[in-house]
Curated annotation (Swiss-Prot):
It is found in: Cell inner membrane. F-type ATPases have 2 components, F(1) - the catalytic core - and F(0) - the membrane proton channel. F(1) has five subunits: alpha(3), beta(3), gamma(1), delta(1), epsilon(1). F(0) has three main subunits: a(1), b(2) and c(10-14). The alpha and beta chains form an alternating ring which encloses part of the gamma chain. F(1) is attached to F(0) by a central stalk formed by the gamma and epsilon chains, while a peripheral stalk is formed by the delta and b chains. Pfam families: OSCP. This is ATP synthase subunit delta. The gene is atpH. NCBIfam families: ATP_synt_delta, PRK13434.1. HAMAP family: ATP_synth_delta_bact. It is a peripheral membrane protein. GO terms for cellular component: plasma membrane; proton-transporting ATP synthase complex. It comes from Leptospira biflexa serovar Patoc (strain Patoc 1 / ATCC 23582 / Paris). SUPFAM superfamilies: N-terminal domain of the delta subunit of the F1F0-ATP synthase. InterPro entries: ATP_synth_OSCP/delta_N_sf, ATPase_OSCP/dsu. Belongs to the ATPase delta chain family. The lineage of its organism: Bacteria, Pseudomonadati, Spirochaetota, Spirochaetia, Leptospirales. The keyword DNA damage does not apply.
Length: 187
């Protein structure tokens, strides 16, 4: 089974449980918080990924670490993921879970990537425009990519809107190559 399939299977199972318990949003918040803690601390991440640590010890540690900090659904889910040695997939499971919640709520996930933060006003304007084009509510996350020269990229569902300077330069280059302008034509 591929990484993508594994994370989808676990995310779908959690989604079904959360839907039955009418706790889609709270389950997402709890899972997001725990994944953030697990993957922000190198010691915790290495512990759960280490082949040297006994699997039953990892499971007990996971159960104790989420006890009282998460609902029964999320606590049992984290314990199951650790028991099945799927800890590495938790970030992907979270993303697939979010996508599932978005589908159920007729919502799209919008990711804006830019060199620097665009600011609230620009993000709101982009959100409003995309929301009206797609006819659904949009959940926005903003990321920075220092490799961008300027501009931004928007990822929504399976679409990419590339308004980066690099894309514009590539388009200009391609147009010039298509016209086959001879060298020295602008002298």
């Amino acid at each position: 089974m591929s990484l993508n399939q594994i994370s989808k299977v676990y995310a779908t199972a959690l989604l079904e449980l959360a839907q039955e318990a009418n706790s889609l949003e709270s389950t997402e918040e709890e899972l997001s918080s725990l994944v953030g803690v697990f993957f922000s601390d190198d010691t915790i991440r290495h512990y759960f990924l280490s082949p040297l640590v006994d699997p039953s010890e990892k499971e007990q540690t996971a159960a104790k670490s989420v006890q009282g900090k998460a609902s029964e659904i999320v606590a049992n889910f984290i314990t199951l993921v650790v028991r099945k040695n799927r800890f590495l997939y938790l970030k992907d499971i979270l993303e697939d879970y979010r996508s599932g919640v978005d589908r159920l709520k007729n919502r799209s996930s919008l990711r804006i990537v830019s060199k620097d933060s665009l600011g609230k006003e620009a993000v709101d304007q982009i959100t409003k425009s995309i929301s009206s084009k797609f006819g659904r509510e949009v959940r926005v996350t903003e990321h920075t990519d220092l490799n961008l020269i300027g501009g931004f990229k928007i990822y929504i569902d399976d679409f990419l809107i590339d308004a980066s300077i690099r894309a514009k330069l590539a388009g200009t280059r391609e147009a010039l190559l298509q016209k086959k302008i001879p060298v020295g034509a602008f002298e």
